[in-house]
C-alpha cells in the first residue's frame, strides 16, 4: 500500500484531532441522555419555503407570522455575540436559522455555539426576513438531532479528489449541488420513461437475475453457485430471452428497467453493473422501434430538463430534430470518405486496414469473421466516435446479430439498429427472430464460436427454442442504456458520475 505523503499525513492528523474532539462532545451528550433524539417532525422544507415566499417582503412575513419546523444539516455557522446565524441544508435546499439567547434561552444558545458544521439540527420558529433581505427562521426552539463526528470537506474546495467523490458518495452528495442535481435528473428521466411506456400500453415486468444459462447479449457473465440446488448460475447479462418468452405467453407489450451484470472492463462508458431498459412489442418491426425510441428519448429530456435542447461537453445538441439513419458502410464512407465500395467488400483489405488501425485480427472473434463483421469493426474504428448527433446505424450483418430477424430483401443483413449519440451507443434494437429452426441454427453457430475461444459468444438455450416452437408473433425489441442516457442528459463525461455507487478497486 502506498505510504501517505507529508501533506496527506498532516491532514489525516488534523482530522483525527477533530474527530477526537467531536467524540468528546458526543460523550457529553450521551451523559445528558440527549444524544440521538427521534421525536422531531418537520412541517416545511427549505426549497418550498424559498419558493413560496420568494416575493414576500419583511412586512408581509411579519404580519403572517408563519410557524415552521425545519430540520437539516448545518453547513455554515456565524456566532456574533448576542445573535448567530446558521445555514441549514435539508433534502430540498438551504435556509438560514436566526438564533438569539433571548429566543431560545441562554442554555440552548451556549450549546448551539459548540455545535459543529455537519451536525443535524432542528428548529421551530417563525419565518421572517432579515434586515439584509435573507429569508430565515427566527428560532424559538433549537435542537441537535445527530452529531457529526467527521468534518465536512473545506467549503471552498469541496471534494477535489474524483475517486473520493465516487467512494464516499454520501459526502459528495452533502457538499456538491451538481451531484444532487444529476441524480434528481436521473430519477426524473426514469419516471418519464415509465410513464411513456405505460401510456403506450406496455406492462412493466420483472424477470430473473439469476440465470441457468446466460443469454440475450454477447458478453462475459459473472458466475456463481446455488448451494441448495447444487448448480452453476449466472448473473444476468440481459433479460431479453425471458421477456420474449412473455411475448410467446400472450403479453404483447412488456418492458423491464433493471440491472444487468457483465464481467468485463471498467471504462468511462462501462461499469460491471448497469441499468438497462428492454422492451418488446408484438406486431412491430425495427422501423417502428426507431420511431418509438426517438420519441421516448426526446420526452425523457423534456421531463428531466425542461427542454429537448441540451449541452454536452460544451456542444449543443437538439434532440427535437429528426434522428439520422445510416447503414454501416454509409457511416464509414461519410466519416472516412477515402474508402471505396470495392475496398469495403474486400476481406483481405479490411483485415489489413483493421490491423493498421491497431485491431488484433488474430483474436477468436475475427478468425472466421465475414465481410459484415469486418465492416462493423472498421465502422467502430473510423465512424462511431464521430456520430455526435443522434444517429441510427441500421442493417447489421447476421453474423453479429444472432437474435435478429434477417432482411427479406438483402441476404446476410438483419433488421437491426444501434442508436449513437455523442459517439456513444445508447440503444440497440431489432425485429426479433421468431423462427425456432433458424434460431437453433444460429445458437449452434454461437456454440462453435465459443468452443473456438470466443468468451462472449452465446450458449444454446434449449428452453428458449421450445418457447419459440409454441409460436411467437412478429415482434420488435429494443434495449436502452439508462446510465448512458443519463450521462447525455446531465452532461456527465463518465458513467461513474451517474451511478450513485460505481465499482472501484478496494481501498487496501
Curated annotation (Swiss-Prot):
The keyword Aminoacyl-tRNA synthetase applies. InterPro entries: Aa-tRNA-synt_II, aa-tRNA-synth_II, aa-tRNA-synth_II/BPL/LPL, Lys-tRNA-ligase_II, Lys-tRNA-ligase_II_N, Lys-tRNA-synth_II_C, NA-bd_OB-fold, NA-bd_OB_tRNA. Its main location: cytoplasm. One of its GO terms (cellular component) is cytosol. It catalyses: tRNA(Lys) + L-lysine + ATP = L-lysyl-tRNA(Lys) + AMP + diphosphate. Binds 3 Mg(2+) ions per subunit. GO terms for biological process: lysyl-tRNA aminoacylation. Its cofactor is Mg(2+). Mg(2+) 1 binds at residues 418, 425. One of its GO terms (molecular function) is magnesium ion binding. Keywords: Aminoacyl-tRNA synthetase, ATP-binding, Cytoplasm, Ligase, Magnesium, Metal-binding, Nucleotide-binding, Protein biosynthesis. It comes from the Bacteria. Gene3D superfamilies: Bira Bifunctional Protein, Domain 2, Nucleic acid-binding proteins. It is an enzyme of class 6 (ligase). It is found in: Cytoplasm. The keyword Aminoacyl-tRNA synthetase applies. Its EC number is 6.1.1.6. NCBIfam families: lysS_bact (TIGR00499), PRK00484.1 (NF001756). Belongs to the class-II aminoacyl-tRNA synthetase family. Homodimer. PANTHER family: LYSINE--TRNA LIGASE, CHLOROPLASTIC_MITOCHONDRIAL, LYSYL-TRNA SYNTHETASE. This is Lysine--tRNA ligase.
Amino acid at each position: 500500500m502506498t505510504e501517505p505523503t507529508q501533506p496527506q499525513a498532516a491532514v489525516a492528523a488534523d482530522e483525527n484531532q477533530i474527530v477526537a474532539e467531536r467524540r468528546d462532545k458526543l460523550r457529553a451528550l450521551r451523559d445528558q441522555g440527549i444524544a440521538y433524539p427521534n421525536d422531531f417532525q418537520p412541517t416545511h422544507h427549505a426549497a418550498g419555503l424559498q419558493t413560496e415566499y420568494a416575493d414576500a417582503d419583511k412586512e408581509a412575513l411579519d404580519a403572517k407570522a408563519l410557524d415552521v419546523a425545519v430540520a437539516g444539516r448545518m453547513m455554515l455557522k456565524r456566532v456574533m455575540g448576542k445573535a448567530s446565524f446558521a445555514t441549514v441544508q435539508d433534502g430540498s435546499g438551504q435556509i438560514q436559522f436566526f438564533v438569539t439567547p433571548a429566543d431560545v434561552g441562554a442554555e440552548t444558545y451556549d450549546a448551539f455555539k459548540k455545535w459543529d458544521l455537519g451536525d443535524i439540527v432542528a428548529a421551530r420558529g417563525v419565518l421572517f426576513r432579515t434586515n439584509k433581505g435573507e429569508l430565515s427562521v427566527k428560532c424559538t426552539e433549537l435542537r441537535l438531532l445527530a452529531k457529526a463526528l467527521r468534518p465536512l470537506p473545506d467549503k471552498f474546495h469541496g471534494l477535489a479528489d474524483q475517486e473520493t467523490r465516487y467512494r464516499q458518495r454520501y459526502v459528495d452528495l452533502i457538499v456538491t449541488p451538481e451531484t444532487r442535481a444529476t441524480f434528481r435528473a436521473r430519477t426524473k428521466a426514469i419516471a418519464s420513461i415509465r410513464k411513456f411506456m405505460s401510456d403506450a400500453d406496455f406492462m412493466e415486468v420483472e424477470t430473473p437475475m439469476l440465470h441457468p444459462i446466460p443469454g440475450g447479449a454477447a458478453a462475459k457473465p459473472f458466475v456463481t453457485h446455488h448451494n441448495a440446488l447444487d448448480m452453476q448460475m449466472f448473473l444476468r447479462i440481459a433479460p431479453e430471452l425471458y421477456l420474449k418468452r412473455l411475448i410467446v405467453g400472450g403479453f404483447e407489450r412488456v418492458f423491464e428497467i433493471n440491472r444487468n451484470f457483465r464481467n468485463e472492463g471498467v471504462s468511462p462508458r462501462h461499469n460491471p453493473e448497469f441499468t438497462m431498459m428492454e422492451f418488446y412489442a408484438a406486431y412491430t418491426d425495427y422501423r417502428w422501434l426507431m420511431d418509438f425510441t426517438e420519441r421516448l428519448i426526446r420526452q425523457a429530456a423534456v421531463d428531466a430538463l425542461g427542454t429537448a435542447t441540451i449541452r454536452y461537453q460544451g456542444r449543443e445538441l437538439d434532440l427535437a430534430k429528426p434522428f439520422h439513419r445510416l447503414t454501416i458502410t454509409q457511416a464509414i464512407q461519410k466519416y472516412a470518405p477515402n474508402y471505396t465500395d470495392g475496398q469495403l467488400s474486400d476481406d483481405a483489405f479490411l483485415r489489413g486496414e483493421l490491423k493498421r488501425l491497431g485491431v488484433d485480427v488474430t483474436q477468436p472473434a475475427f478468425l472466421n469473421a465475414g465481410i459484415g463483421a469486418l465492416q462493423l469493426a472498421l465502422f467502430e474504428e473510423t465512424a462511431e466516435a464521430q456520430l455526435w448527433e443522434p444517429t441510427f446505424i441500421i442493417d447489421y450483418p447476421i453474423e453479429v446479430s444472432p437474435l435478429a430477424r434477417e432482411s427479406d430483401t438483402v441476404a446476410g443483413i438483419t433488421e437491426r439498429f444501434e442508436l449513437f449519440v455523442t459517439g456513444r451507443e445508447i440503444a440497440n434494437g431489432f425485429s426479433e427472430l421468431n423462427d425456432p429452426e433458424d434460431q437453433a441454427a444460429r445458437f449452434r453457430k454461437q456454440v462453435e464460436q465459443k468452443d473456438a475461444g470466443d468468451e462472449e459468444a452465446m450458449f444454446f438455450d434449449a428452453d428458449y427454442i421450445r418457447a419459440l416452437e409454441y409460436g411467437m408473433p412478429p415482434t420488435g425489441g429494443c434495449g436502452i442504456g439508462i446510465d448512458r442516457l443519463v450521462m447525455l442528459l446531465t452532461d456527465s463525461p463518465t458513467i461513474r458520475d451517474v451511478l450513485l455507487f460505481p465499482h472501484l478497486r478496494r481501498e487496501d
